C-alpha cells in the first residue's frame, strides 16, 4: 500500500472525469486522474455537439481558447426513406449569450484540452493505465488497483464511460438491458472549409447540426447524425442494441448505405476518410440511472447513464459536465466534514436534483419508451414521403384535396395508431 493518499482518484479522462478533476483541483484537493487510453479522449466518441451552458459556468468564455470546431447556427431534422428526404431547416444568427451557444467538437481535441486545464489547476494525470479493480475495506471503497499497484483515496469517482465495469463490480450498476443501449458508428470525413460552407449554406465559422430518422437505421430504433467541423464533417448513426438482432443489415452496412443516400452523397463527395469509430451509447434515460453513491465512491457522466436523446437533439456532454461539477462540489464539502460515507456523499444526488441533470432526465423520462415505437422509424417516414410525393406530383390527372391525400396515407398506419402515438409523443415531450 502506498504511503500517499489522494483526496480523490478519478477513473477516466473524458469530459466528466476531466471537469471533476478541474473543479476539485481548483479547491486545493490532491487529485489523480487515471486513463486507460494513451491520452485523454483517445477512446471516446461523440456525435459531436457540446451545449455550452454547463462548461461556460465552470470556464467562462472557454470557446475563445478551447479547440471547438464551429458554433451551431443551422439545425436540420430529416425523415428519410431509401430514395427521399423530408427536411425541417432552422437557421438563426449566432447567439450573443455564451450560455445559449452550442459547438461542434472532436473529442480527440477537446478532451486533452480539458485535461490540460485540470493539470494546470494541480491535478495529476496518468494515461495508459487500466484500473483493474477497486480496493475496499469492508463496504467502503478506499482506492484502486492497477496491475500490482494500489493507490489510496478518500473517494473514487467513476467516470469510466457507458457500461461501467467498475460500477458493476460494486453492484451499483446492474446487468445491461439491451434496450437501454445503442451502438453508434461514426466517420470523420475531411473537406475544405469552403466546401463545407457551400454545401451546408453557412458562412465563416457557423456550423450545422443535422439529425435523421428512418432509413439510416434501416427502419429500426435509431437514426443518423451529421455535424460540420472546421475542415471535416462527423457523419454517423446509432441503432438500438435490442434491435440489432432483428436487423437485415449490419451496422457498418447501414452506415455505408446512409452515405450513399441521395441527400447525403453530394455532401461528402470528394471527401477523405480521416477517422472511423464505434461505441456503445446510453439510451435508457432515467430508467438506466444506477445507484450513484456508496461509501467512498460516486458515478458520473456516461457511466451514470446521463444522456438524453430527444429525437430533435441529443445531449450527453453538457449533462456529463454538470454531473462532474456536482460530484466535485460534493467531494470538496465531504473533505471539510472529513466524512466520505455514503450518507455524506449523498449530497451529490441533491446537487444533481437541483441541476439540469435530474430535472431534465425526470422531465423526459418517457422518451426512451416512445423511441421504442417502430412506426417512428419505418411507417411514419414513409407516410410523410408519400404525402409529399403526391402533393408535388402533377401529371394531368385531377388532384385530390390535400386533406384526402393525407387521410389516404394515414389510414395505412391506422387512425387509432396515429391517435395513440400522438398522445404518447405529446405526453413524453
Regions found by a protein language model. Give the residues of each.
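Active-site-proximal substrate-binding core of FAD-dependent oxidoreductases
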Residues: 326-377
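C-terminal auxiliary extensions adjacent to catalytic cores
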Residues: 370-429
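FAD/FMN-dependent oxidoreductases across multiple families
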Residues: 216-221, 230, 243-323, 339-342, ...
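Short beta-strand to alpha-helix junction loop
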Residues: 96-116, 244-250
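Conserved Rossmann-like nucleotide-cofactor binding loop
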Residues: 16, 39, 163
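N-terminal FAD cofactor-binding segment of flavoenzymes
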Residues: 27, 37-84
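Predominantly flavin-linked oxidoreductase catalytic cores and closely associated redox partners
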Residues: 117-264
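N-terminal Rossmann-like FAD-binding beta1-loop-alpha1 element of flavoenzymes
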Residues: 6-33
Amino acid at each position: 500500500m502506498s504511503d500517499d493518499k489522494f483526496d480523490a482518484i478519478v477513473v477516466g479522462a473524458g469530459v466528466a472525469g476531466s471537469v471533476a478533476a478541474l473543479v476539485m483541483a481548483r479547491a486545493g484537493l490532491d487529485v489523480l486522474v487515471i486513463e486507460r487510453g494513451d491520452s485523454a479522449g483517445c477512446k471516446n466518441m461523440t456525435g459531436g455537439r457540446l451545449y455550452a451552458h454547463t462548461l461556460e459556468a465552470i470556464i467562462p468564455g472557454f470557446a475563445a481558447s478551447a479547440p471547438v470546431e464551429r458554433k451551431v447556427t443551422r439545425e436540420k431534422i430529416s425523415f428519410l426513406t431509401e430514395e427521399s428526404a423530408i427536411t425541417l431547416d432552422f437557421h438563426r444568427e449566432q447567439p450573443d449569450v455564451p450560455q445559449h451557444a452550442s459547438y461542434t467538437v472532436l473529442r480527440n481535441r477537446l478532451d486533452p484540452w480539458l485535461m490540460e486545464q485540470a493539470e494546470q489547476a494541480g491535478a495529476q494525470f496518468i494515461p495508459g493505465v487500466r484500473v483493474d479493480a477497486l480496493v475496499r475495506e469492508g463496504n467502503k471503497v478506499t482506492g484502486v488497483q492497477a496491475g500490482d499497484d494500489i493507490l489510496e483515496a478518500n473517494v473514487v469517482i467513476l467516470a469510466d464511460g457507458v457500461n461501467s465495469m467498475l460500477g458493476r463490480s460494486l453492484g451499483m450498476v446492474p446487468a445491461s438491458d439491451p434496450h437501454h443501449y445503442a451502438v453508434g458508428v461514426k466517420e470523420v470525413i475531411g473537406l475544405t472549409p469552403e466546401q463545407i460552407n457551400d454545401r451546408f449554406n453557412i458562412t465563416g465559422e457557423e456550423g450545422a447540426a443535422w439529425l435523421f430518422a428512418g432509413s439510416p437505421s434501416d427502419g429500426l430504433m435509431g437514426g443518423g447524425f451529421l455535424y460540420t467541423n472546421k475542415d471535416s464533417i462527423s457523419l454517423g448513426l446509432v441503432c438500438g442494441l435490442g434491435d440489432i438482432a432483428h436487423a437485415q443489415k449490419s451496422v457498418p452496412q447501414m452506415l455505408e448505405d446512409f452515405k450513399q443516400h441521395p441527400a447525403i452523397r453530394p455532401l461528402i463527395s470528394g471527401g477523405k476518410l480521416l477517422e472511423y469509430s464505434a461505441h456503445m451509447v446510453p439510451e435508457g434515460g432515467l430508467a438506466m440511472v444506477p445507484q450513484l453513491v456508496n461509501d467512498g465512491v460516486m458515478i458520473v457522466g456516461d457511466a451514470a447513464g446521463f444522456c438524453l436523446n430527444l429525437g430533435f437533439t441529443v445531449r450527453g456532454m453538457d449533462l456529463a459536465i454538470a454531473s462532474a461539477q456536482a460530484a466535485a462540489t460534493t467531494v470538496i464539502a465531504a473533505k471539510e466534514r472529513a466524512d466520505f460515507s455514503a450518507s455524506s456523499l449523498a449530497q451529490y444526488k441533491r446537487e444533481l436534483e437541483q441541476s439540469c441533470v435530474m430535472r431534465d432526465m425526470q422531465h423526459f423520462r418517457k422518451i426512451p419508451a416512445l423511441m421504442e415505437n417502430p412506426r417512428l422509424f419505418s411507417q411514419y417516414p414513409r407516410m410523410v414521403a408519400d404525402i409529399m410525393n403526391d402533393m408535388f406530383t402533377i401529371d394531368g390527372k385531377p388532384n385530390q384535396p390535400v386533406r384526402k391525400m393525407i387521410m389516404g396515407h394515414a389510414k395505412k398506419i391506422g387512425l387509432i395508431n396515429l391517435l395513440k402515438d400522438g398522445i404518447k409523443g405529446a405526453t413524453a415531450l
